[in-house]
Structures are given as C-alpha cells and as structure tokens.
Amino acid sequence: MKCAIVTVITLFICSLIYSVETEEENHLAIPEDPYPTLPLRNYSCNNMACPIKHICGCMPTPITPETPFRDLDCGCYHEFDMMPVCAD
C-alpha cells in the first residue's frame, strides 16, 4: 500500500514538472511561418514606372494587431517626404 501511495505521489510530481515545462515552451514558442497570412505585397521596384519627382523604394509596414510582423511594401514614393503615391 505504501508503494502505491509513493508511486501516485511520484507520478503527480512528475506530471506537474512536465506541465510547467510545456507552459514555458508555449510561452516562448515562435510561430512557424506567419507570412502566408499576410497580404501579398509588391517586392519589385522599377524607377521607370514611377512618375516624375518620385522614386521607387521599399518601406517597412506598420505593426498592427492584424499584421504583427514587419513586412516590406515596395512602390513609388514622393521624392522628398517618402509618402506613397497611392494609398492601398
């Protein structure tokens, strides 16, 4: 009977230790590949396609709750203030 109680207590302690480790692992888990959920963006740049006094460049996208990861948005921007020509 003592052996059964010791076994149950040992199994209980081991299960607690394992559950604490998995919570830490889940807390530190990095998503495998978040980019397929992001909208498709234009990564190519061609200055010939931009209007006069505009340059083609890539700017980082803002971090929002919908897109919590940085991405690049390439396109035509105003030469002096780097504001996009068209808002998507």
Curated annotation (Swiss-Prot):
Segment forming the signal sequence: 1-22
UniProt KW keywords: Disulfide bond, Secreted, Signal, Toxin
UniProt GO molecular function: toxin activity
Stretches that traverse the bilayer: none
Keyword presence, Secreted: yes
Primary location group: secreted
Tissue expression per record: Expressed by the venom gland.
Record's subcellular location: Secreted
Modification after translation: Contains 3 disulfide bonds.
One Gene Ontology cellular component: extracellular region
Family affiliation: Belongs to the scoloptoxin-12 family.
Name the UniProt record assigns to this protein: U-scoloptoxin(12)-Sm1a
Species: Scolopendra morsitans (Tanzanian blue ringleg centipede)
